[in-house]
Amino acid sequence: MKFTNCREPLFLFLFAVLVTTLFSTCSFLYPLNPWDDANVYMTIGNAMLGGKELYVDIFDHKGPVLYLMHEMAAVLSRNSFVGIYLIEIICVFCFMRYSLRTMRLFSTSKATLPLACLLGWVTASSDLFYYGDSVEEFSLPILAHSLYFMLRFARNRQVPSRWQALVMGVGVGLIFWTKFNILFFYVGGIAALALIAWRHSQMKELGQTVLWVIAGWAVTTAAVLSYFAIHGTIEALMESYFMVNIFQYHGTATNGEPDFWWFPLMKLGIWAVLTIPVCLVRARWEVKALLLGTYGVLLLSFATMTVQFYYFLLMYTFAPMLIYLFRNLKPSLRTYVTIGLVGFAAAATNWNLVTLINGTFPKSVLEMAEIINADKSDDSEVLTFSSYDTGIYQHTRHLPPNKNFFISSILDPEIKKEQAEWVESGKVKYLVREIGAIVTCHEYYDAPIPENYRCIYDKEELFRYRLITTPHKFLWNLTYPRVLLRYVMEPVTVNQRMLIYRREP
């Protein structure tokens, strides 16, 4: 099949629509996004649209770009993730597009287009994609774009144009003001590029490119700082984003996995795990240096934090390098390998689609919202008490009543104190609580329900559902011996308990 320059991007875009629709719970196929983090982002976006000041009237520790994006999404729909769904489609498309360009740096095979589609499918269907709407997902196309131009320089000594470098810098700025520790990718990359440029007497060209990248970063930074300067909240930005993340946020109260050395092996997936060994065997030294710099430093950066498994979605940035496998296959074998990979991708279905099909998708929040929405009184304020955001604010007419409207992974006694004061003040009629899925038994979350609140809703439901019938999950599970027998014997479910407490006269 021949594709013109116009048809190929259109094909990739339509494929991005397909995989995003199937696997992201932000799409119209799903009644809601049950992930706590995504609900926090959307709640803050709604609150900002409703007039609350970020980091002053409402708080979470991520960067402002993430919440500004969700504020824009809230303009389209306050009660759904349709705006985020559209952004996800663009992100998946850009990721596939630049992954395809990366593969074509190393191969002229016609297999590059189906492989790019295959990569898009496997990435979106991966457990690492989670429910959709993660910082890592939005960073993936930016990293793929940067890796393409870095590899083009490493392989062909071709520097980006000023415009290309400026766009790359804007992407760096977006990441910087969303989750700055992802920038370790660029730290290793710049070090490797400097070595390559020095060996090939191109330090001047590289220096000029870096200056244009910095200029792009400055454009994004100026836009962000201007927004907060207009609102008079720059000090709150610096305190809440930089100081909190550097000195307070450690994720110790969540289900993060501290065992750094084996955890990546379990969750990276076949694509990313095979990438670096293949490249180290087949690639020239410049490509090896760049991949070791970007991949290695980014991976090592995870050792500085408590690791959530979906952080490793970033490693799919390097999966296009598997084109080396196809370069060295006999033409007669490429067709069979492609067919096998297509079969593998078809089996690689994450739990979102599985639960939607079998009717176990978690949606008790909709029932909870129906109960609260039936209360037409003026004193029906809602607070997610001593737990993460359940998504209740998206499905009711309410905005969070206070700054710390949920309990995060920041173990700050002041957050608990503020919640307790709001409850004691009598201003909150409904307390919504989630137990079991994300929050561990850490004592920080063990806050007693006041005696004047009565439970009016209590339901346990599925939060996560894992199958062992798909090849990639079975191989991942082999690296997790403590639960191997349980995975092999039966599907593993992770349940959550959803509760509503109402204040009694």
Residue ranges of model-derived segments:
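Membrane-interface alpha helices of multi-pass inner-membrane proteins
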Residues: 162-182, 186-191, 219, 295-303
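Membrane-interface transmembrane helices that cradle and orient dolichyl/undecaprenyl
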Residues: 144-167, 201, 271-287, 327
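Transmembrane-helix motifs of polytopic, lipid-linked glycan transferases
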Residues: 86-107, 145, 149
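Hydrophobic/aromatic-rich transmembrane helices and adjacent perimembrane loops
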Residues: 184, 300-334
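Transmembrane-helix signature of polytopic, membrane-embedded enzymes
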Residues: 96-123, 140-141, 157-159, 163
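Short acidic/glycine- and proline-prone juxtamembrane loop motifs at membrane-interface regions
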Residues: 128-138, 308-309
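Short periplasmic/luminal acceptor-recognition loop of GT-C membrane glycosyltransferases, typified by
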Residues: 357-442
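Hydrophobic, aromatic-rich transmembrane alpha-helices
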Residues: 97, 266-299, 319-322
